[in-house]
Amino acid sequence: MTKVELAKLRTMIPEMRRVRRIHFIGIGGAGMGGIAEVLANEGYQISGSDIANNRVTEHLASLGAEIQIGHKPENVHGASVVVVSTAIHGDNPEVMAARELRIPVVRRAEMLAELMRYRHGIAIAGTHGKTTTTSLIASVYAQAGADPTFVIGGLLNSAGTNARLGTSRYLIAEADESDASFLHLQPMVAIVTNIEADHMDTYGGDFTKLRATFLEFLHNLPFYGLAVVCIDDPVIRELLPEIGRATITYGYSEDADVQVQEFVQEGSQSQFRLRLQDGSFLPLRLNLPGRHNALNAAATVAVALEDHIPTDAIVDALAQFAGVGRRFQQYGEFDTGAGKVLLVDDYGHHPTEVRATLAATRAAWPERRLVLVFQPHRYTRTRDLYDDFAEVLAKVDVLIMLDVYAAGEDPIPGADGRSLCRSIRQRGTLDPIFVATPAEVPGVLADVLKDGDVVLTQGAGNVGQLSRKLAELKLSINAMKTAI
């Protein structure tokens, strides 16, 4: 951003008083790194720490951020404010040092709320579909020349980043319910894609509390704000009479304000039309597969039309959408030495997400054998949704199961990869292969792959690094057998 553009931005969005250097603990996460990037481009000094370097930290360093590997008390010296990710606890040495030095410590969502304060905020919440919906909206607004600021939980392929500082009043961002921190946000438009049991440890195992928290999030809208919600979701349908804000519904349901009709998947693309609120129809081609992604597109259209985004920009952006990192990301088809095999990677880590991804994969390549490499994410989620996982994972042709990616949690007996394998095996339809570490997966794949297979790697942990490794090896049988 040029000095002239930044000066113009400052006429709309004043600086945070007395804040010069902002320190991020856990800066390597996509959400934290995205906010840090926007603030760096706004002219703030950025520093941060994490336990290891990654693409996010390397990118931020290229923007001038000071990155420290490891958490040490001295890292926070000179900071005006410290921002912490969900994974950072009060006993972190940098948090303790900041409090001793009386430096404000705020959560990620509080800093996002500050970015949103003077902007037209569009916040996307829900158990599933947040990242894709946020990316679709950002792409549509960019296509229309609206130049939005966006903060996304995944890499927007067309932009080459997950965050960008725009010159307009629009800020498009994911709203994270995992720790209820989305309640800090006060957007002008709030989307809720669905509400299912997840992160239940945050809500004391009480689904009623989770439901009430989503309602509170919607009530953070001003009275002149707009809620956009998926009426196909039974919990949202039940909530509708309680939402005291202007509301637009979308879905496949006949009574949706914006209804998805005539859905057809062609390979890894989709075609459908939307019946809009005025009764007119909008035919669309979406460069994504799956009925669930048509819903994400419907939410996007509902929001964009309310902001008077031109229809041709909407149509073009959805047809040309270049995707999001780790959301049905196709690495391509490789000649393995035993035939041609397609590699796809996906972030889905909840049974509903896995089910939707498997359905989209089957629809795209119905004649091909589906080999799933799955890594459960969090022991609490595996425990709470154990039967659902066992049911959906049994529906592939070959299942390679990794152990649980802990994400900082302590192990829970019976809520692990081996136990899931036993439960699936007892169903009698599939014999899963348990693999203790991602490093062992290439060798196992080398023994099971056949010509025409689709390999789908799925999960929210480090299985994404595994998929990149497999792509580097080009799924070569010989290379995978010797990989370490």
Swiss-Prot record:
GO molecular function terms attached to this record: ATP binding; UDP-N-acetylmuramate-L-alanine ligase activity
Pathway this chain belongs to: Cell wall biogenesis; peptidoglycan biosynthesis
One GO cellular component term: cytoplasm
Localization (cell): Cytoplasm
Keyword flag Magnesium: no
Entries under SUPFAM superfamilies matching the protein: MurCD N-terminal domain, MurD-like peptide ligases, catalytic domain, MurD-like peptide ligases, peptide-binding domain
A matching Pfam family: Mur_ligase_C
Record has Transport as a keyword: no
Reaction it catalyzes: UDP-N-acetyl-alpha-D-muramate + L-alanine + ATP = UDP-N-acetyl-alpha-D-muramoyl-L-alanine + ADP + phosphate + H(+)
Summary of the function given for this chain in its UniProt record: Cell wall formation.
Similarity comment: family membership: Belongs to the MurCDEF family.
Identification of the protein by name: UDP-N-acetylmuramate--L-alanine ligase
Species annotation: Tolumonas auensis (strain DSM 9187 / NBRC 110442 / TA 4)
Origin organism lineage: Bacteria, Pseudomonadati, Pseudomonadota, Gammaproteobacteria, Aeromonadales
The encoding gene: murC
